[in-house]
Amino acid sequence: MDILSQDIMYLPGVGPHRKEILGKELGIHTYRDLLEYFPYKYVDRTKLYLISELSQDMPFVQIKGRILSFEEAEMGKRKKRIVAHFTDGHGVCDIVWFNGTKYIYQNYQVNKEYIIFGKPTFFNGRFQFTHPDIDDASQLQLNDMGMQPFYVTTEKMKKAGITSRAVEKLTKMLISKLTEPLEETLPPFITTHLHLISRDAAMRKIHYPKSVDDTQRARVRLKFEELFYVQLNILRYASDHRRKYRGYIFNRIGAQFNWFYSHNLPFKLTGAQKRVMHEIRADMASGRQMNRLLQGDVGSGKTLVALMSMLIAIDNGYQACMMAPTEILAEQHLQTIKEFLKGMNLRVELLTGIVKGKKRQEVLDGLIDGSINIVVGTHAIIEDKVQFQHLGMAVVDEQHRFGVEQRAKLWSKSENPPHVLVMTATPIPRTLAMTIYGDLDVSIIDELPPGRKPIQTIHKYDDQMASLYSGIRQQINLGRQVYIVYPLIKESERMDLKNLEDGFEAMQDIFPEFQLSKIHGKMKDKEKEAEMQKFVCGQTQILVATTVIEVGVNVPNASVMVILDAQRFGLSQLHQLRGRVGRGAEQSYCILVTNHKLTKETRKRIDIMCDTNDGFEIAEADLKLRGPGDLEGTQQSGIAFDLKIADIARDGQIVQMAREEAQKIIDDDPTCQKIEYNMLWER
């Protein structure tokens, strides 16, 4: 039996109770799990500080000296605070304990020399160390200490005595049991070419490093390995998919496309739109299924590109569908497409949950007999009952709301899988796109159509509301509409957030001369629909809402977006909300309202929003500030991945390196037959 598959209970120092806590809190069940539970930081244990050199902003430090005396203070019922006065000859500090009286007096003696390791804090005129690590100075060789690893632990673990130091001791115990070198997981041609240390050396050095260089080399090796296998699996999946699924060959540009291009094109295509259309046309004529991700900021003209792609399918005798994440968005796409296709003899229908009875049957019949050219809808389109005569093109809007299973259901609607174009207005940084959407080819529309004015973003504090209300009034009197966004629907006892209901009433009092709508996540779809419709039609001038308006709503007349408690939102979310305005020819504004208590990170977020409208710049900054968040581990190609040490946000260079090495192997062995790569496919 492989030693790393051993149950963690059998490691000396664990036992049944610790096994249960390690399993529940950290998911550590085997020796392998413990070995792959990596430290989050290190502290240099080769250096000693003098008490006279200590300062409050120091992290963990160690000092050498002796205990002068002990002192006790009662702290309520049967609780004591024990203080040891400690000197190194250059100053005096205190060691403080709040429990463990018997242990302390049994193990630590006055005038004996100890090495103290902990974080210094300043209290009552002198530095103190609370519950530090204490070692007998005569038994500790500093040169052997190297870098001390620190492991993330939970409150439950600490209560059970499983501290970072305890995890460190267990890991060292495990490493001492590994008498044989760990099996290598990367082929020699990769480790040699990239100068990576062996897996065995990396695992030992990451838990028991002697120097900073040890930690760096170990981390690079293990991060590369993790990211390499993610990329290899993604590229292998994409390669298999391309070989298995033939695509329809759409090499004809016919009457519908040409008429639209000559008569109905609302504006001259931007250079970016032309480039993307060229990429899409090449895919559709290639004989293999198109799987393309189309990224573009709000208002960049993605829908127009998608429609032109659908017209190519129609000219080649096939049908097209467009899936949206919400009914509101599906209806807006339907109206937009019908407007674009005015005067053209094409049948475009809606299929969502609200299309029922006779009308629904008409749509289902029209899809089967081929009389419907384009259907726009929600997930209702992928229901088993929905069948097409010839589905050749599928457009999916806002991909992160549709997983790989939904895409696969679309493929089953036709003899060959339809060409798939995935649209997203959420800009995805390159390193993340490479991992999350690694099986899709990526196109980017990075220009706005002519005539669009950049949105002005302004930061205001919550004590400047009077001038803000005056500005809102001015805009509405000019005939514009306004969004006011709150972060939560229910009050939180822990956070001073405004309640949307109270906010709505307050806004009615402040703007009695205007009509207001409200939308929040707790409302039924029909209620939301009705309130939204009032705003879209211009019956109401102000929409008070939570972030349910984040995706897709298009009201060209809305020129002001006010985001209250903006410090509570992430960068990408703020950018998405801002994208609800700026859709008409008039100047638009996004007002970020915060309190004065801003952290350094929050201030940075607000500054970035005010400085740029570039979604990709914002996405990169958000990834660095916040990390990949929900996207991590939800690989869209259907390949799950769990990153234990790599960080897509900060390890872009290693992601790129891993991608290049994986691509070389797939190019050299697309069918995974070559013997020299066997170890890679067996993992």
Feature-to-residue mapping (PLM):
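Long, highly charged, low-complexity intrinsically disordered interaction regions
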Residues: M1-P12, K24, V230, D240
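Short, surface-exposed secondary-structure boundary micro-motifs
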Residues: R66, K119-P120, N233, A566, ...
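C-terminal accessory region of SF2 helicases/translocases
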Residues: A585, Y589, L598-R683
